[in-house]
Amino acid sequence: MKRRLVLPLAWAVMALALAAPAAAAPTREVVVLTSFPKELFEAYKQAFEEKYPGIKMVVKQQQTNQAVTYLRETRAKPEADIMWASAVDAFQTLKGDGVLDKIALSKETLARMPARIGSFPLHDPDGHYWGFAVSGYGLMWNTRYLALHKLPAPKEWTDLTDPRYHGHLSISAPSRSGTTHLTVEVILQAYGWERGWALLMQMGGNMGAIAERSFGVPEAVISGQLGIGVVIDFFGLSAIASGQPIDFAYPTLTAVVPASVAVIKNGPNGENARAFVQYLLSDEGQLKLFSPEIGRLPVVPALYARAPKGYPNPFTMKLGGVEFDDKLSSSRRNVVNALFDHIITFRHAELRTAWGAIYAAEARTGKVRAQGKNLDDGSRDLAEARRLATTVPLDGMRAADKAFNDAFKDKPEVKSRLETEWDTTAKTNYGKAIDRADQSARLR
C-alpha cells in the first residue's frame, strides 16, 4: 500500500518540476566605480548591457578622491572591477599603490590609437590604465548672463582676476573634484607655485560660489545663477550641443590629458571588466562620446571624420601650452587640495570680502589720481593689501618634497597642525588686507 502511494507522489513532484519555469541563470556583473555624471554612465550602461546581455553594469558613483581612498581601503578584498574617471593623476596614484591590474589590448585596438596627445601619454606605458577620451580644461559662460551684466567673455585664466567679474564666477573645490584638482595643477604648473597661487587666490576672491561637486558649476552657469565657470571641456561642449546659451574656451595655457579606465587588481569580475574596457575603446564605444549628453573627445583620431559639425579635434587643434607633469601632480595631490580648502574654500567669505575691499579702494584711487592728488601712502597700503590676499602660506620647494608629502599623508598630527596654520594665516591675512584697503581709502 505504501509503495503504491509513493510512486504517484514521486511522479507528481517530477511533473511540477518540469512544469515550473527554469531558474534564471545568475546574472554576471561588472562593478564600475566612477566620478562621471549620470548622463554619461547611464548612456554607457544601456549600450554595454545591450552589447553584452549577460552582464549587468553596476555603477557606484563617487568623487575621485573618495574613490581613491575607497580602493585603497578595500584592496585586500576588492569590491569594484573598474575605475573610470578624468583625473589622470589619480590613476598614477593608484598604480603606485598597487591597486590596478595590468591588461593588454589587442594589436588592432592599439593600432587605432596614438601613444600620445601632444607630448602627454594617452595611456600608462605599463598597461595599468588606458585613456578612453581626451579632456581639456577651460572656461564656460552663459552668453545671456554676460549680456545682461555687460561683462566681456573670458579667454584666459588671468582674465578671471578682472574686478568686473567679482561675484560672477564659479569653481568646485579640488578636494571634492578630480577634474578641478587637475585644473588647479594646470594653473600651478603653467605659472609656477607662487604666481599660480596668487592667481588662484584672486580668482577665488571673484567666485560667487565654490561648488561641492564639479557638476554644480555647469548647473549654476546653465541656469543663470552665475555667469562663468571653471570646468572640464565636456561640461561646456555637452551644454552647447544641447542648445543651451553657453560658450566655451580653452585658455592658451591649459593641458589636454586623457580621461582613463583601469581594471582593479583581483576584482570580483575580471573577465567582465576587460570586456568593458574593450567596449569603451571600440568604434561603438568611442562614437558614443559625440552624443550631446556626453560631449567628450575620442582617443581614435580617425573617428573625428564622423564628428558633429564644428566639434573640436584635439589631434589637429593647437591645444595645450602646458607640459603637464602627472607624477608631480600625483605626489602633492593631498597637499594641494588641503591648501586650496584652507586658504580659499573654507575662507571664501573673507577672501571675497578682501578682494571687494581692494577693488573698491582701487576704484577710488583712480578717481583721486585723476584729480592730481598725492597717493603715495594709499598706494603702499593697497600694494600691501594685495600682497596679503595673494601670498600662499607654503613654500613651493617644500610642497614638492617627497618626505613632506608622505608625512602629510601618513601622519594625522602633521596634517592637522599644518592645516590649522594655513587656516589661521589665511584668516589673519585677509582681515589685514581688508584693513589696509580701508586705510588707503581714508587717506584720500
Describe the role of every protein-language-model region.
Residues 140-145, 257-270, 288-289:
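A bilobed periplasmic-binding-protein/Venus flytrap-type ligand-binding module shared by bacterial periplasmic
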Residues 78-85, 210, 227-232, 247-249:
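Paired acidic/hydrophobic, glycine-rich loop segments that form the ligand-binding mouth/hinge
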Residues 359-444:
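C-terminal non-catalytic accessory extensions
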Residues 25-92:
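Early extracytoplasmic/lumenal segment of secretory-pathway proteins
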Residues 35-42, 79-222:
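Extracytoplasmic ligand-binding site segments that recognize negatively charged/polar headgroups
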Residues 168-172, 199-204, 210, 241-267, 279-301, 305:
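Periplasmic-binding protein-like
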Residues 89-93, 222, 226-245:
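A ligand-binding cleft/hinge motif common to bilobed small-molecule-binding domains
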